[in-house]
Amino acid sequence: MTTLYITHPAGLQHIPPAGHPERPDRLRVIERVLEHESFSTLARDQAPAAPFHRIALCHPMDYIEAIQDASPVEGLVRLDADTSMSPGTFEAALRSAGGAVMAVDEVMTGKVNNAFCAMRPPGHHAEKASPMGFCFFNNAAIAARHAQNHYGAERAAIIDFDVHHGNGTQDIFWADPTVMYCSTHEMPLYPGTGAVSERGEHNNIVNAPLRAGDGGDEFEQAFETVILPRLRDFRPDLVIISAGFDAHLRDPLANINLLEPDYIWVTRKLMEVADQCANGRVVSLLEGGYDLQGLGRSVAVHVTALMRG
């Protein structure tokens, strides 16, 4: 089984304000972890910059250009309370989306079995025409649309286990029966969306919120009783994971208590669905995860599971 690891140094050049949790050290710790000899068989590549027409599969062109125009020559530009741009942010965002596109290309053509893209900024809070929650372009949504438009995938599934609900992904696919979006997340918590009652126009949105203090048992129950049955019924041609690791016990931004075995378990379960429905095709894209030790450990077991099944 071949797993591709995609990253790029440009991801380090998106510089947030001092003390911001979504910081370059996140990619540095992932790089250090994946340099270990146990990952020597990983295929590796660098994320290209996504062309505007690929990003425009999910975002209006005038929005893309507005983000480009907002890019500062020096210093920081704040777009909302949580989301700022430095001079390197726009290229990093293009390559974050481009890494997602590359992952789809490599998986859909059968060059690799699956792929993990570790880039920043993340994407799942970005709505069609709104940056939000550290996010500019919705990488998972772009990946799904690219698989459909370029490779003829009839159905794509995005499974999001970040502790924050992916309001942007839900927004983009709310009225699209060809994409299923499934999410576990703490509720109530930022951004305030993700209730069970939010189902989409075609019942293609599956929200399974968790409560503060929940851990692996509740997480696995949400998948076993809600998400996995819906995924199997949907029979996706591609499984895309919005891989946020901020539901880890150590994470400072939330109150869910997952540990490394929980991330192994969910990765294997999603690979089983992909094996049953999608010829094993899995694309995993980094979202959140803000405790560096918890992030490094979680990514290590997630990628190990992708490599070994």
Model-derived regions, located:
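HDAC/HDAC-like amidohydrolase catalytic core signature
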Residues: 1-159, 164-309
